[in-house]
Every structure is written in C-alpha cells, then in structure tokens.
C-alpha cells in the first residue's frame, strides 16, 4: 500500500491568520533592520566616545527608522505588532515614527542654527563617519528602488521611510566632512542643513501619518 502523500508546503493559515510569503523585499528589509540597529549602536558608541550629542542623536534616528522597518516586516509577514494587522494601521504608525524622530532632530538642529558649537571630530573619525553615512544613504536608496517595483501600500510606506532616513543622513555627512576641512565653526550651516532636511523628513512622516491607503484585496 502506498504511503500517504504529505504536504510539505508552508500552511497558508497559522493561528487563524493568513501566512504571507516572504518576498525578496521583505528579506532585504529584515537585513536592513539588522544593519540599521548595528549602525545605530556603532553611532552611539562613537558618539559617547567623542562626547558628540549630534552623533548620538543620529544613532537615535537610525534606531527609529529600524523600528519603522521592523513594523513593515512584521505586518508584511502576517504578524500583528502592537495590534497592527494591515497596511491601514501600519502605514500611519510608520509615519508617526518618522514624524516624531524628525521633529526631535529639528529641535536639536535649531540649537546649532542659533549658535551652539558644532561637534568637531578627529580627521580619521570624521572620515569613518562620512563613509558609513554615505553607505547608509546608498543602502536606503537601494531599498527605495527595490520597493518601487510594486505599488502595495506597505511598500510605499517603506519607500518613504527610506527616503526620510536618507535625508537625515546628509547633514551628518556634511558635518563630519566640514569638521576637518574647515577650521572655523560652521554651526549655522550645519543647523540650517539639519532644519531643511529634517523638515522634509517631517513632511514625509506627517503625510504618512494622515494618509489612509486603500486596503489591498486579499
């Protein structure tokens, strides 16, 4: 008698929820969450070692973007983080994280704009910060391009989150490069850059927060 056939496929339903397939974008986002959290930890350690509040603030922002991406991964794979179970709930939640972190970033940039001295880094420290920051920008842009290939609401939210993260990276790269290429204090310009790009990121977060995407059909 022939042995009964077994179905080795992943079940479509787990605990009453529909199990979603892990797409390439979701897998890459999982890796970006790990990379982002590691980068945030590195920024925090470096910021504490050189007593740079500015660098610690960027570590906080990077961690917040990692949290937003984690929400995407959990909901995209069928999870319910914090009670969120669809794009309709996750989309504004990601926007709220982006908006809150961006406003907090702008408040510190305002202090630089009003005259608080900019952080100065040793040449090699500044080069390391600039290189890792530019690498972060490239990865964020790559993530946005990858997510652009599909028009699902959550992928759109991921694309906007990556864009906001890239915008906030620019002032850090600028401050790191200027700290060893110029001897004069450039707090005004660093603060202005932070305010401008922080405002753009905050606008993105606000739009995500109040936008209500259409729920895709099952």
Predicted region positions:
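N-terminal topogenic module of multi-pass integral membrane proteins
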Residues: 2-72
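Helix-coil boundary and interhelical linker segments in multi-pass alpha-helical membrane proteins
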Residues: 42-56, 109-124, 177-188
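Generic alpha-helical transmembrane segments
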Residues: 61-69, 101-105, 123-142, 166, ...
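Juxtamembrane helix-capping/reentrant segments at transmembrane boundaries
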Residues: 79-100
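Hydrophobic alpha-helical transmembrane segments in multi-pass integral membrane proteins
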Residues: 102-110, 164-181
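Alpha-helical transmembrane segments in multipass membrane proteins, preferentially the mid-helix core
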Residues: 133-150, 170-177, 205-209
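Membrane-helix boundary/juxtamembrane motif in polytopic membrane proteins
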Residues: 143-168, 217-218
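Small-residue-rich transmembrane alpha-helices that serve as helix-helix interface/gating elements
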Residues: 186-204
């Amino acid at each position: 008698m022939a042995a009964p056939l077994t179905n080795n496929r992943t079940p479509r339903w787990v605990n009453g929820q529909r199990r979603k397939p892990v797409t390439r974008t979701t897998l890459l986002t999982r890796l970006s969450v790990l990379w982002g959290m590691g980068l945030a930890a590195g920024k925090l350690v470096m910021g504490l070692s050189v007593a740079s509040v500015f660098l610690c603030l960027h570590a906080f922002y990077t961690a917040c973007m990692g949290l937003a991406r984690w929400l995407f991964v959990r909901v995209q794979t069928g999870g319910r983080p914090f009670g969120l179970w669809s794009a309709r709930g996750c989309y504004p939640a990601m926007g709220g994280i982006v908006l809150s972190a961006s406003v907090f970033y702008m408040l510190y940039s305002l202090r630089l704009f009003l005259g608080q001295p900019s952080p100065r880094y040793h040449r090699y420290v500044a080069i390391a910060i600039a290189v890792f920051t530019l690498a972060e920008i490239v990865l964020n842009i790559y993530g946005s391009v990858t997510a652009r290939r599909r028009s699902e609401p959550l992928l759109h939210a991921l694309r906007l989150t990556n864009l906001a993260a890239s915008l906030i990276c620019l002032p850090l790269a600028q401050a790191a490069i200027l700290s060893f290429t110029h001897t004069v204090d450039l707090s005004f310009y660093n603060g202005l850059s932070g305010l401008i790009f922080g405002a753009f990121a905050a606008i993105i977060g606000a739009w995500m927060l109040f936008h209500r995407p259409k729920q895709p059909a099952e």
